[in-house]
Amino acid sequence: MTEAAAYRKGLDFARGLDARDPLSRFRDRFHIPPAAAGEPEIYLCGNSLGLQPKSAADYVTAELDKWRRLAVKGHFEGDYPWLPYHEFLAETMAELVGGAPGEVVTMNSLTANLHLMMVSFYRPTRARHKILIEDHAFPSDRYAVESQIRFHGYDPADSLVVVEPRDGEALIHDDDIADVIERHGQSLALIMLPGVQYYTGQVFDMAGITRLGHDRGCVVGFDLAHAAGNIPLDLHDWDVDFAVWCTYKYLNSGPGAVAGCFVHARHGSSAGLPRFSGWWGHDKASRFEMGARFDPMPGAEGWQLSNPPILSLAAIRASLDIFREAGGMAPLREKSLRLTGYLEWLLSEALGERISIITPREPNRRGCQISLRVTSDSYSGRDLFAHLAAAGVTGDWREPDVIRIAPVPLYNRFEDCHRFVEIFKDFDRNNAHT
């Protein structure tokens, strides 16, 4: 019997799944925003901003209190002194992305880190100057890539290679990525693709892409904004050169929080690798000697520029502690597959051809997110999205016509999926042409 065949309609079935869920207790560790009626929102937007851990306020308040009590001495005193504070996040963050010790650091923002990585890893020559990205890449990635191309004196019209879906399709075929790498391999300086595509929710074959790219002499990096904390990653063993990600989505660190960066160990101590430098990347044993010569720390820490914002790191630590307590990505991924499988089944049963799910139907090719388009002649996607918001469902709208729904395994329930689809069904029934 297939898993879909085991699903049943009705709220009792959803509640039964929740009752048997070993991760259900973690929902109470997060603040669920209230809806207008006083009930908790049906929050399905963790792919845009994760919910606040209830412990985050305590973690942040502890650092505010330390500042009040100790002032500058807080850099060196207390359970979590500020000077090495980023190090307290390193082990769990590395585990979540499959990094080895020293390969991961929490710093800056995603796009800032992408620029820092491209300073080191995009070294164009007349023969090899192209960068491969995907069609409909997240705009900030494309802006960064095109600006780097121009900075080096090249034209994106010549140096930007875009792999696209086939006509009439939303997803990009693995074979087409391989074909583009094969055709442009000798002129590609950098492959820069997402781990999970933000618009469609498609998981890319990062191991395969890295292998293909390296076989043709390309540097391979990934934007993991929608992958970190969402799907299992194994960056070190996949031999990825670098990766960047934000922490405010699935990692629940708060709006605009500090981002993450991975640099493979084989690059971490490369003396000849160019970089933009700052004092926080200097060898910590001699940093405060204030010497004139930059001596980088080994590993990803050597790309740090300035001392990080402690209050933001405190909020990240609160969330990472929950990930560790939950057992890391393996149990979360297991629940995520069941959540999205159940949600996909409910949508297909209830709406049929009146919607189009553009996220891959194969569970291993998607993360938490289901992206859908309304295909009904009776109402638009915007009409539906407005109704969902008014009914206490928080999803995510992406132009021109996609609604993204993301049940997150740390705090979403099967009941959330059921209630969302019931609200959708009622709207569909009430707005159908007769």
Task: Label every model-predicted segment.
Residues 1-434:
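Pyridoxal 5′-phosphate
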